[in-house]
Amino acid sequence: MKLKKKFLEKSKKIAEERIDVLMNLAEKESKDGKADRSKNYVLLGKKIAMRMRMPYPKEWKRRICKNCGSFLIYGKNARVRTKAKNYPHVVITCLECNSITRIPIKTEKK
């Protein structure tokens, strides 16, 4: 039983490293203007995470459009705005498919 647990921990660590490498490649390709290759890297990273049954890293999850799967580069193919109407939040708009992602901002309670 210990061997299996050790093997799973090691394979999850390898999967995290591969996802990180793929997302860095996706960022590089997206900056160079090769959006289709960037989407392929994102899909590969998602497949690895699903196969290993592990959550996608939060720092990368927010850089991917949930609707079209493109890698978001703020200012190039994504727009970022802060709003404070009902509750303070950040609005990220994908400029390729016009989907909106809202991320709440935690405020201090007085």
From Swiss-Prot:
Catalytic activities: Endonucleolytic cleavage of RNA, removing 5'-extranucleotides from tRNA precursor
MF terms in GO: ribonuclease P activity; zinc ion binding
Cellular component terms per the entry's GO annotation: cytoplasm; ribonuclease P complex
Cofactors named for this entry: Zn(2+)
A Pfam family: Rpr2
Binding site for Zn(2+): 65, 68, 94, 97
Location relative to the cell: Cytoplasm
Entry's family note: Belongs to the eukaryotic/archaeal RNase P protein component 4 family.
Name by which UniProt lists this protein: Ribonuclease P protein component 4
Organism, scientific name: Methanococcus maripaludis (strain C6 / ATCC BAA-1332)
Gene: rnp4
